[in-house]
């Protein structure tokens, strides 16, 4: 009887241990899966929120340029050629107010195609830490083939496409600074007359990305259309 009882107790204990082992394994697996799901949801939420924040920033820059562009197009409608210089001055006074209300602007400009005028060149303003926006000498566009989209991309690309365009990171000819820019072509009597644009310091974009925090060791990055890793320019 003792032998049978001992065997029965041993079998019961083994059954309990097996049941506990299975329950523990199920519990650990469930907790691990729950943690994985929570991590996935957190990653998705963080990336979505970060992307929306950056997208909103891009849209604010676009809106600033498009606002100036639309006002310029309206003022140029029916304008005599002799008033070109005066209208450019009006744009100058308008643009500076909008630029100060757009975060991260490094430069803004309105450049006239030299095929339209050899004397009215437009303007180019650069933000300086202590002095705000200051006018700088403009690039001599007449020294370039404006049909060659590999040069002066901020001018030649919107001229070629005929629409507003974001340009990938490039170095400005005069400042040697890495920037991205949004540029819109301007027309007068259905003829291309110049480009309005804003350049944003590339550092501003990288800071927006670096501000996206994912747990303790995670990080965010961007990929361009060629799958180049950002924030570094490669």
Annotated model-derived regions:
Residues 130-203, 207:
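Extracytoplasmic/periplasmic ligand-binding sensor regions of membrane-associated signaling proteins
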Residues 4-11, 15-86, 104, 164, ...:
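Juxtamembrane extracytoplasmic/periplasmic/luminal helical "stalk" adjacent to the first N-terminal
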Residues 106, 181-182, 217-219:
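Short loop/turn microsegments at loop-to-beta-strand junctions
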Residues 29-36, 132, 207-210:
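Juxtamembrane transmembrane-helix termini
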Residues 88-100, 195, 199-234:
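Solvent-exposed, extracytoplasmic
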Residues 111-113, 169-170, 225:
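Active-site-proximal beta-strand/loop segments in catalytic clefts of secreted hydrolases
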Residues 59-163:
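Extracytoplasmic/periplasmic sensory segments of membrane signal-transduction proteins
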């Amino acid at each position: 009887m003792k032998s049978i009882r001992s065997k029965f107790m041993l079998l019961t204990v083994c059954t309990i241990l097996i049941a506990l082992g299975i329950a523990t394994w199920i519990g650990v697996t469930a907790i691990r899966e729950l943690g994985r799901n929570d991590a996935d949801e957190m990653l998705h939420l963080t990336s979505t929120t970060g992307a929306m924040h950056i997208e909103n920033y891009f849209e604010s820059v676009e809106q600033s340029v498009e606002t100036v562009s639309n006002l310029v197009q309206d003022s140029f409608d029916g304008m005599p050629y002799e008033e070109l210089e005066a209208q450019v001055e009006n744009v100058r006074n308008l643009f500076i107010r909008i630029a100060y209300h757009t975060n991260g602007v490094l430069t803004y400009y309105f450049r006239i195609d030299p095929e339209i005028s050899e004397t009215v060149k437009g303007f180019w303003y650069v933000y300086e830490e202590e002095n705000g926006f200051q006018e700088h000498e403009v690039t001599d566009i007449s020294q370039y083939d404006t049909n060659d989209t590999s040069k002066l991309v901020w001018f030649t690309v919107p001229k070629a496409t005929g629409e507003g365009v974001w340009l990938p990171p490039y170095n400005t000819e005069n400042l040697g600074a890495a920037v991205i820019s949004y540029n819109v072509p301007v027309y007068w009597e259905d003829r291309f007359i110049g480009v309005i644009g804003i350049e944003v310091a590339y550092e501003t974009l990288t800071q927006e990305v670096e501000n996206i925090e994912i747990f303790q060791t995670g990080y965010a990055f961007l990929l361009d259309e060629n799958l180049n890793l950002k924030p570094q320019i490669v």
